[in-house]
């Protein structure tokens, strides 16, 4: 974001604060971040689609008028929810408008190390990201971050970009999604601009590519990225990649997969209750919102899936409070989230549904759990299924044993103890159990 735009926005906020009630200003206006100026349009980042809808229908004219008072000029404004797709569109518009700045893609101003909440589920990934940001090209190269949807991978990617530029603004940092990389390559081939494409991606200091798993199966993209990777790596330039799965589970050429494993691999898990509470407190603090502690604990306890849905639930509660002009209480939060909570309750968990979910994850048949087979490809998933039956249902140990081919309750105890130990010591097991639980709970 440029300095001029920031000054305009700060003055605009001053005007809007005098026009609106405190709760309306804090709920809707203070959550906006100025992103960029494209032609005659000011692009404003908002936290969710719900906010975007309210702002467009109720506050757009007010904001435009305030900006006009500050600048003495008529500007259009665009509210953007900073998903990768929208950021890609914005980057493309900015480039077409003749922006000759460094090749940095639009970074979400909210995604910094300062706003990242550290917990057991992401501590290692955060430490690795910070180490890379402090010494790009020298610490871990490449850094490969993986984990499920909405767990903070993109936040860390943006945070690395921000940190590097804060330390040295002359660094050429390029952040893109794998989809954008692929689309630019296709256009370069079509328009005979291959050298221009290669120059863009190989004459930089730091390359961050989100969702790298999507290049799998795209032969030309894999080939081009292989050579891009080599060029940057040999020049000691930093490469950071993110994915929803570890390199060995992505269907890539062996030579590319092995390169992804050259540096450091860090996984991110679903946040535990304490981290979820800390995330909600941080969000409320950053947006200057007063949310009672019991409401934060209530939301954190009910929404255990991922950070994106967790923050979305808080936004929903705050919006509901603002629109109904009622105080934020546990009762109000329960009412605001009733469709989400009832959907979660509707999920019936029993041994059969757990066995099916585990079997689906490991690509085996549920009947195998009741067989006498003891090979690891069957025994290990069976132990995970037993562990989840024990954790997620009220079934007794003997009853669980019956559901697994009439096995003794001591076998179930052994399975639960083994998987508990594996979760503590093995990130692959931890990730598998976490993902299966998310699938089961619909989170």
From Swiss-Prot:
InterPro entries: AAA+_ATPase (IPR003593), Chromosome_initiator_DnaA (IPR001957), Chromosome_initiator_DnaA-like (IPR020591), Chromosome_initiator_DnaA_CS (IPR018312), DnaA_C (IPR013159), DnaA_dom (IPR013317), DnaA_N_dom (IPR024633), DnaA_N_sf (IPR038454)
Major localization class: cytoplasm
Spans annotated as Domain III, AAA+ region: 106-321
GO biological process, one term: regulation of DNA replication
Stored Pfam families: Bac_DnaA, Bac_DnaA_C, DnaA_N
The keyword Cell inner membrane is assigned to this record: no
Region described as Domain IV, binds dsDNA: 322-443
Gene Ontology, cellular component aspect: cytoplasm; plasma membrane
The keyword RNA-binding belongs to this UniProt entry's keyword annotation: no
Region Domain I, interacts with DnaA modulators, residue ranges: 1-75
One annotated GO molecular function: DNA replication origin binding
Chain segments carrying region Domain II: 75-105
Subcellular location: Cytoplasm
Function: Plays an essential role in the initiation and regulation of chromosomal replication. ATP-DnaA binds to the origin of replication (oriC) to initiate formation of the DNA replication initiation complex once per cell cycle. Binds the DnaA box (a 9 base pair repeat at the origin) and separates the double-stranded (ds)DNA. Forms a right-handed helical filament on oriC DNA; dsDNA binds to the exterior of the filament while single-stranded (ss)DNA is stabiized in the filament's interior.
Recorded domain comment: Domain I is involved in oligomerization and binding regulators, domain II is flexibile and of varying length in different bacteria, domain III forms the AAA+ region, while domain IV binds dsDNA.
Family assignment from sequence similarity: Belongs to the DnaA family.
Protein name: Chromosomal replication initiator protein DnaA
